[in-house]
Amino acid sequence: MDDQTDQQSSQYTAECLAFIQTHLMAFYERYADDEGISLTQVKQRVSKWDMGQWKQAISQMGDVSDWPDDAKQRMTIVGFIAGIDRSHLLDSIISLGVIKMTVSNQKNITHRLQLDGKTEARRMGDFFDLTSKQSKKVTSIITDPETTKIWSQNLWVDSDKMAGDVQYLVNQHLKHGMSLNDLNDILASHANPKQFKPGQSAADRISQMEFNARRIVRTESARLKDEVNMVTYRMKGVTKVDWVCEPGACLKCQGIEELGPYPINGAPDIPDDSHPNCRCSKIPHIENLNRSYF
């Protein structure tokens, strides 16, 4: 499941980079001279051709009717900014690519979390023989808006910062005159960690958003499963729980496990008391319990 989610996130990153690359190259081919393209050349009034590029970029967003308010608000803002001058229009086009990628990641994460939550709720329902009313209480956690509120807000904050960083990289090169080689360098991605330079490569900076989306999926999936489990345990009268480390768990989680069992209302939370990407779990504390099902 992680591989499928990761592949989708990688696809969104590639689409965002291709979108930005296509439009930057179009502006370069339109306005560059023998010395490249400079900030002076883009600090001009928006032309008819520029507006055509903007309309094309907007059309590439597709149907935005089901986009979240966070995305629609940002689209409105960048629409106003785009009309200031050519430089701001370029910034706004970059923002559009990032916004679309963030919407895709948000939908991908939401779908994955709901799937994981429902799977865990079904597992708990079967194992503990929950009544229909009890099952509804458990599944209500999955659809609670508060479940997605915090991580989605953080996703958009990170998205805004990343868009700003990419815009900064482009504008820094424009200040000194951007050659075609400079443009290619900005857009070059590096799979080798030793070559990874998010402070110099827009592609590498955008890739950081992909890594962030992966972290959110793993972290929030673990949080949701933990909440589903703990609500179920309380309903079934469980008084103590054991912390069960995932294979290859870190020293922190091993220490948490060794300090168990914990009272149901005093047990460490996943991931708040462990760490992002934690895949440990908690099970009812029963002497000589066979843990294989959990």
Predicted regions and their residues:
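N-terminal leader/targeting and assembly helices and adjacent pre-domain segments
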Residues: 1-199, 289-294
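Acidic, glycine-rich two-metal-ion catalytic cores of nucleic acid-processing enzymes
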Residues: 201-294
